[in-house]
């Protein structure tokens, strides 16, 4: 007969495994979507814009700087220090490092038009699955996934609405930054826009 301790240990292990898989899936999906030529995913569009404007720092580094600001914003909204948010930042750091790892090898993939479409579809589905896994694992998750979930709880608005709004704001910021500073919009494509307006519901269906 299983004890409560054994059941708790199994639950924690499953949560940890789900989180590891989610981080690996999301980091690959973000780079794959960008490689497809359809644009960067909304959750990484702001760090991507900073990388293009200030290329001395990698996408991964800009990502955890952005994530730190999201964590700080949540603590300000909560009006207190939340230890689990700090844990989330360390998970985000691992995600950021994996972005740079995946960016280093992704060019080995062939880049025909049919394959680009396939890469986008795969990356879209992977992000939906990855975020749904993160939300259900019961452990600290990547700050870009944590932010809309926590904001939804703080201001009492449905998660899917917050997620779509967050993505659209990220895309608007990216468009303004690259358009005004570089003279042309970088990183935003039809896939980015489609994902931003539908991914909230996609995650809800997947989760």
Q: Would you name each region that the model predicts?
A:
Residues 2-207:
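Core subunits and conserved enzymes of cellular information-processing
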């Amino acid at each position: 007969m299983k004890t409560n301790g054994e059941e708790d240990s199994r639950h924690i292990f499953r949560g940890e495994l789900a989180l590891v898989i989610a981080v690996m899936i999301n980091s690959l999906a973000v780079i794959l979507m960008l490689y497809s030529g359809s644009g960067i995913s909304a959750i990484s569009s702001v760090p991507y814009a900073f990388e293009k404007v200030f290329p001395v720092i990698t996408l991964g580094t800009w990502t955890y700087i952005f994530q730190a600001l999201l964590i700080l914003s949540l603590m300000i909204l909560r009006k207190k220090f939340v230890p689990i948010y700090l844990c989330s930042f360390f998970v985000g750091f691992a995600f950021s490092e994996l972005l740079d790892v995946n960016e280093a090898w992704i060019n080995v993939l062939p880049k025909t038009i049919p394959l680009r479409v396939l890469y986008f579809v795969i990356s879209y589905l992977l992000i939906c699955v990855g975020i749904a896994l993160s939300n259900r694992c019961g452990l600290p998750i990547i700050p870009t996934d944590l932010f809309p979930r926590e904001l939804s709880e703080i201001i009492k608005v449905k998660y899917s609405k917050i997620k779509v709004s967050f993505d659209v704001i990220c895309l608007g910021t990216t468009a303004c930054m690259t358009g005004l500073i570089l003279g042309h919009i970088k990183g935003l494509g039809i896939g980015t826009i489609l994902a931003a307006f539908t991914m909230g519901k996609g995650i809800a269906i997947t989760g």
